[in-house]
Amino acid sequence: MGENGAGKSTLMKCLFGIYHMDEGEVYLDGEKVEIHNPDEALHRGLAMVHQELQPIPERTVAENMYTGRYPTKKFGPIQVIDHKKMFEETAKWLDDVKMPYNPKAKLGTMSIAQMQSVEIAKAVSLNARVVILDEPTSSLTDNEVEALFRIVRDLKSRGVSLIYISHKMAE
């Protein structure tokens, strides 16, 4: 927690491998680790839900969840996206975080809170052991904040560690 400009988001971007750290050490499960890029962070079980969401509004919920890692299947001599598997798995992950949205819905039709829920489901689908939430309530209504907190409590009860960044003392 800290005021605007205190470096909270910068620190999280260092942990996630977006920025290079000049000093300090990071330990994960008691082991010193160096994370040079987001792929390494994901490989080590860290996921981040950024304050500035970067959805692709023209694509479906499922396509946004699986961007860059689409499930594939063989179609003759080539690999093609396995849409059926992608939609089924997306429905499972969304249900897992208690947000049963339609995986085929265009993300651009959803509220900011729903888009954040999709990002959290994406983090869970990556088998993240640590989820960094960077000011997730900054543009949410009170009802949307409560829905987000339900997701956070559920993840915590499952043993997922959460790093929650905020400048709001009440959170």
Label the predicted regions.
Residues 1-171:
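Glycine-rich phosphate-binding loops of nucleotide-dependent enzymes
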